[in-house]
Amino acid sequence: MRLVLLGPPGAGKGTQASLLSDALKVPHISTGDLFRANISQGTDLGKQAQEYMDAGKLVPTSVTADMVRDRLNQEDAADGFLLDGFPRTIEQAELLEKMLQDDGHSLDAVINYVVSEDVVVDRMLARGRNDDNEDTIRTRLEVYRNETAPLIDHYKDVLLNIDAEGTVEDISCTTLNALDK
């Protein structure tokens, strides 16, 4: 299965991706992990990403998309994947669709984890990370609403909305049931 995971920060995408990856036998591909791997391995793409990050700038879509393309071309992703953190914008969604079409594929589903902002704030504050204060969290949620939420409409034909306010196990079961797995 070829899947994209959507949802605000703190929705539990990473947790669910790990469980789904095991259940579906496909790799969990996180853009954060891709950045770290490319930078630590000193790849050309990693060096480009590092330059932008060192300058305090966002890594351009072209660099991120190239990292994703390289990862999707690895053997373990031949039969499917879970993408987490890409696409974040309509432009990136269109690039992903082109990448998949070039290989004769398309997305099977886009899983949108739905969770209230108050629950997100509570979850993220409970993590105890230094950069997780309520103002920062609400700013991240606003960025998500403005940039990533339009993908929900873009993917309406393959979108599965999943209530992400239950237990980890319940959310995982609901997701697998929605995928008929």
UniProtKB/Swiss-Prot annotation:
Q: Where is this region: NMP?
A: 30-59
Q: List the PROSITE patterns.
A: ADENYLATE_KINASE
Q: Record's superkingdom? A: Bacteria
Amino-acid biosynthesis in keyword set: no
Provide the GO MF annotations for this entry: adenylate kinase activity; ATP binding
Which positions are annotated as binding AMP? T31, R36, K57, L58, V59, G85, F86, P87, R88, Q92, R129, R140
The record ties this protein, via InterPro entries, to: Adenyl_kin_sub, Adenylat/UMP-CMP_kin, Adenylat_kinase_CS, P-loop_NTPase
- The EC number(s) attached to this protein equal 2.7.4.3
Q: Pathway, per Swiss-Prot/TrEMBL?
A: Purine metabolism; AMP biosynthesis via salvage pathway; AMP from ADP: step 1/1
The catalytic activity, as recorded, is: AMP + ATP = 2 ADP
What does the entry list under GO cellular component?
Answer: cytoplasm
> LID: where is this region?
126-132
Where does it live in the cell?
A: Cytoplasm
Q: Respond yes or no to whether keyword ATP-binding is given for this record.
A: yes
Which BP terms in the Gene Ontology apply to this protein? AMP salvage
Q: Where does ATP bind?
A: G10, A11, G12, K13, G14, T15, R127, G166
Which keywords fit this entry according to its UniProt record?
Answer: ATP-binding, Cytoplasm, Kinase, Nucleotide biosynthesis, Nucleotide-binding, Transferase
Q: What is its main location?
A: cytoplasm
| Domain-level remarks | Consists of three domains, a large central CORE domain and two small peripheral domains, NMPbind and LID, which undergo movements during catalysis. The LID domain closes over the site of phosphoryl transfer upon ATP binding. Assembling and dissambling the active center during each catalytic cycle provides an effective means to prevent ATP hydrolysis.
What does the similarity note say? Answer: Belongs to the adenylate kinase family.
NCBIfam families, alphabetized? adk, PRK00279.1-3, PRK14527.1, PRK14531.1, PRK14532.1
What does the subunit section of this Swiss-Prot or TrEMBL entry state?
Answer: Monomer.
Q: What does this protein do?
A: Catalyzes the reversible transfer of the terminal phosphate group between ATP and AMP. Plays an important role in cellular energy homeostasis and in adenine nucleotide metabolism.
The protein's name is Adenylate kinase
